[in-house]
Amino acid sequence: MTEVTNSLPTSGLLNEANDEFLGLTLALSKGRILEETMPLLRAAGVELLEDPEASRKLIFPTSNPNVRVLILRASDVPTYVEHGAADFGVAGKDVLLEHGANHVYELLDLKIAQCKLMTAGVKDAPLPNRRLRIATKYVNVARAYFASQGQQVDVIKLYGSMELAPLVGLGDLIVDVVDTGNTLRANGLEARDHICDVSSRLIVNQVSYKRKFALLEPILDSFKNSINSTS
């Protein structure tokens, strides 16, 4: 693996006139993505100085003074990167498909936080002979998928506990990410149609990619080396 710990400047990039941070800002979300991104960052010489899971802070310094980390909701990561509030970020492919992140560069499949985006419904229950109701937080993905199947559906936006919807008649099916399927089975549901495979992707702001490439390049190279060494 290429050693990149000393590839970046050791003095923090700060515009002293207005305290503007001129280094790299990385957007991450708590949970599985954060946990599985940490080894990649450590290999690139970037380590958080505090545990985000044990803190209420939202901005974290790292062992590299020219890299800081923002902790966001997963669904907000593409927005922060797209608008330049973060230079780069890690987001699930499911979030990118739902967001329609057309104005960021999707540079790497990090092959972490892997799962599947699927439809699911009550086990062995036939679907009604009418326009289906689909409960999901992936409204755009659901509409696009069923349209590709030639089906018109009513999509009901939910923010969590999708598994409940078919059990109480709110939706005929759900669209959600499925890992082991244990949560579905525990609630009497079964996975049905496979929509797409999901993994976390490294996304970069288009302007930052050009203007800060010298800072980004060693981190990108390290990520690539880490991915190649485990594939």
UniProtKB/Swiss-Prot annotation:
Query: What functional role does this protein have?
Result: Catalyzes the condensation of ATP and 5-phosphoribose 1-diphosphate to form N'-(5'-phosphoribosyl)-ATP (PR-ATP). Has a crucial role in the pathway because the rate of histidine biosynthesis seems to be controlled primarily by regulation of HisG enzymatic activity.
User: Is Transferase included in the keywords of this UniProt record?
Assistant: yes
**What is recorded about the domains?**
Lacks the C-terminal regulatory region which is replaced by HisZ.
Known partners and oligomeric status: Heteromultimer composed of HisG and HisZ subunits.
**EC number, UniProt record:** 2.4.2.17
- Catalytic reactions of this protein: 1-(5-phospho-beta-D-ribosyl)-ATP + diphosphate = 5-phospho-alpha-D-ribose 1-diphosphate + ATP
Per UniProt, the enzyme's principal EC class comes to: transferase
Q: InterPro entries given for it?
A: ATP_PRibTrfase_cat, ATP_PRibTrfase_CS, ATP_PRibTrfase_HisG, ATP_PRibTrfase_HisG_short
Q: Where in the cell is it found?
A: Cytoplasm
Q: Which UniProt keywords apply?
A: Amino-acid biosynthesis, ATP-binding, Cytoplasm, Glycosyltransferase, Histidine biosynthesis, Nucleotide-binding, Transferase
The molecule here is called ATP phosphoribosyltransferase
Sorted alphabetically, the Gene Ontology cellular component annotations on this record are: cytoplasm
Q: Which GO terms describe its biological process?
A: L-histidine biosynthetic process
What is the native source organism of this protein?
Answer: Psychrobacter arcticus (strain DSM 17307 / VKM B-2377 / 273-4)
Q: Which domain of life is it from?
A: Bacteria
> Which pathway does the record list?
Amino-acid biosynthesis; L-histidine biosynthesis; L-histidine from 5-phospho-alpha-D-ribose 1-diphosphate: step 1/9
Tell me its family.
Answer: Belongs to the ATP phosphoribosyltransferase family. Short subfamily.
List the molecular function annotations (GO) for this entry. ATP binding; ATP phosphoribosyltransferase activity
